[in-house]
Swiss-Prot record:
Any Pfam family matching the protein: Proton_antipo_M
Disulfide-linked positions: none
Keywords: Electron transport, Membrane, Mitochondrion, NAD, Respiratory chain, Translocase, Transmembrane, Transmembrane helix, Transport, Ubiquinone
Protein name as catalogued: NADH-ubiquinone oxidoreductase chain 4
Alphabetized GO MF terms: NADH dehydrogenase (ubiquinone) activity; ubiquinone binding
Protein purpose: Core subunit of the mitochondrial membrane respiratory chain NADH dehydrogenase (Complex I) that is believed to belong to the minimal assembly required for catalysis. Complex I functions in the transfer of electrons from NADH to the respiratory chain. The immediate electron acceptor for the enzyme is believed to be ubiquinone.
Family: Belongs to the complex I subunit 4 family.
The protein's Enzyme Commission number: 7.1.1.2
Enzyme class: translocase
GO process terms (BP): ATP synthesis coupled electron transport; electron transport coupled proton transport
The reaction(s) this protein catalyses: a ubiquinone + NADH + 5 H(+)(in) = a ubiquinol + NAD(+) + 4 H(+)(out)
Cell compartments where the protein resides: Mitochondrion membrane
Length: 231
């Protein structure tokens, strides 16, 4: 069910990150050398999840693996125990909660009309549902983390914190961000561009779907303008 996927991606997955933040507070702040393997492991896990996204043919699986990759960044930021790292981790959890929930919502919008989640069978939707294509573009751009979204603020904080803590981590971070941009654009092009394979009549997007997407995208834009609400 789509509601379960949205709640799982937006809330339950983030509770794990919140639990790690609470647990890290009772541990002693140690030297860089001790935590470096765990940070590298978290970032390597994020890269592997991103690469898994690139080879997915199922839309829902792709979005689920993208959540896993973003949580890798969150874990890496929490482990270093710096104020910027914690602020970035909290912001990214909130931002990705909105983004992944919006992506699951859009995937369901597509599924209700095509009855399939296979990427190659859902192409050409820009001809059928142009407004939905706009939402797809906006949400994928948020997933890539472009300004002025919350995702950009959070990834900037995490990147700065990790680079100051250990400059070598920028290699893994940069690779992760590059692959994130690749699979996000791949997802958008696969579902929206190209010739449509649908022959049956498709109903237009409803007002409730536009309202749902507005309520996901608006906080992402607004909170980045006033970040003290969450930091």
């Amino acid at each position: 069910p789509i509601a379960g996927s949205m709640v799982l991606a937006a809330i339950l997955l983030k509770l794990g990150g919140y639990g790690i933040i609470r647990m890290m507070q009772i541990l002693p702040t140690t030297k860089t050398d001790m935590f470096l393997p765990f940070v590298v492991l978290a970032l390597w896990g994020a890269i592997l999840a991103n690469l898994t996204c690139l080879q997915q043919t199922d839309l829902k699986s792709l979005i689920a693996y993208s959540s896993v990759s973003h949580m890798g960044l969150v874990v890496a930021a929490i482990i270093i125990q710096t104020p910027w790292g914690l602020a970035g981790a909290m912001t990214l959890m909130i931002a990705h909660g909105f983004t992944s929930s919006a992506l699951f919502c859009l995937a369901n919008t597509t599924y209700e009309r095509t009855h399939t989640r296979i990427l190659i069978l859902t192409r050409g939707f820009h001809n059928i549902l142009p407004m939905a294509t706009t939402w797809w573009l906006l949400t994928n751009l948020m997933n890539i983390a472009i300004p002025p979204s919350m995702n950009f603020t959070s990834e900037l904080l995490i990147t700065s914190a990790l680079f100051n803590w250990c400059p070598t981590t920028i290699i893994l971070l940069g690779l992760s961000m590059l692959i994130t941009a690749s699979y996000s654009l791949h997802m958008f092009l696969s579902t929206q561009m190209g010739p449509t394979l649908l022959n049956n009549q498709t109903e237009p997007t409803h007002s409730r779907e536009h309202l749902l997407m507005t309520l996901h995208i608006t906080p992402l834009m607004m909170i980045s303008m006033k970040p003290e609400l969450i930091m």
